[in-house]
Swiss-Prot record:
The gene is RVE2. This is Protein REVEILLE 2. Regulated at the level of mRNA maturation by RH42. The RVE2 pre-mRNA can be alternatively spliced, generating a poison cassette exon that harbors an very early in-frame premature termination codon. The resulting severely truncated mRNA is not efficiently translated. Induction: Circadian-regulation. Peak of transcript abundance near subjective dawn. Up-regulated transiently by light. The keyword DNA-binding applies.
Length: 287
């Protein structure tokens, strides 16, 4: 019995919920406060006259009508044009719908980047007096390149031929200073080394390389040997020319490396190094 009562109560609850689901809700009552805009016959006649005079210039039509805004005139024109197109051939009145206004084309449709030239290019353009020639369509009016080129041409054209040599010297000095600034400096073990450009070093004259070789070859070979802890004697060898593959070049490199060794060294190790230097000198007699 208890089970039957529970089943009946559940069935009755389901029926009540289903009836609530199908129950239609009433719409919330509201009042229309803003009425539809009405056009009088006089306003419509003024509107048609303005259409014939000004076309789709809504601001001028607004001034001509006087009582309606441009937004209201535009919405009224859309309704009027649909009505004229619908009643075409039925009504005797022939009203020409003005064509839509052409869209304005932008002056620069895509953003353009300002190209900043390098310092070397600017110096070269000023020296030669030639500027980069580009099409007017591909160049913006506020271009940095055109401005620099015009300045360089104007300065060269205005100056006299007597002052051309002074200008060239000043420009060369500026270019040299710019190249010196571009060189990189490297600091290793408390010493600064200037790292130059590989291409510029390869493009040097052969005469300079020859001078450097002669200078390095003519340097004297100096060997230092200490006979006591306080006194040191230097042996200066006479100058001579040698080839790069000779044994004397290896001797010089080994001796200079040993002489340039700095820092603390134990006494026994130092004695061995000095003995090695003496042996090297004896094995390669210098004449």
């Amino acid at each position: 019995m208890a089970m039957q009562e529970r089943c009946e109560s559940l069935c009755s609850d389901e029926l009540i919920s289903s009836s609530d689901a199908f129950y239609l809700k009433t719409r919330k009552p509201y009042t229309i406060t803003k009425q539809r805009e009405k056009w009088t016959e006089a306003e419509h006649e003024k509107f048609v006259e303005a259409l014939k005079l000004y076309g789709r210039a809504w601001r001028r039509i607004e001034e001509h009508v006087g009582t309606k805004t441009a937004v209201q005139i535009r919405s009224h024109a859309q309704k009027f044009f649909t009505k004229v197109a619908r009643d075409f051939g039925v009504s005797s009145e022939s009203i020409e719908i003005p064509p839509p206004r052409p869209k304005r084309k932008p002056m620069h449709p895509y953003p353009r980047k300002l190209v900043i030239p390098d310092a070397k290019e600017m110096v070269y353009a000023e020296l030669t007096g030639s500027k980069l020639i580009q099409d007017e369509d591909n160049r913006s009016p506020t271009s940095v390149l055109s401005a620099h080129g015009s300045d360089g041409l104007g300065s060269i054209g205005s100056n006299s031929p007597n002052s051309s040599s002074a200008e060239l010297s000043s420009h060369t000095e500026e270019s040299l200073s710019l190249e010196a600034e571009t060189k990189q400096s490297l600091k290793l073990f408390g010493k600064t080394f200037v790292v130059g450009d590989y291409n510029s070093s390869m493009s040097c004259d052969d005469s300079e390389d020859g001078k450097k070789k002669l200078y390095s070859e003519t340097q004297s070979l100096q060997c230092s040997s200490s006979t006591s802890e306080n006194a040191e004697t230097e042996v200066v060898v006479s100058e001579f020319k040698r080839s790069e593959r000779s044994a004397f070049s290896q001797l010089k490199s080994s001796v200079t490396e040993m002489n340039n060794m700095r820092g603390f060294m134990p006494y026994k190790k130092r004695v061995k190094v000095e003995e090695n230097i003496d042996n090297v000198k004896l094995s390669y007699p210098l004449w």
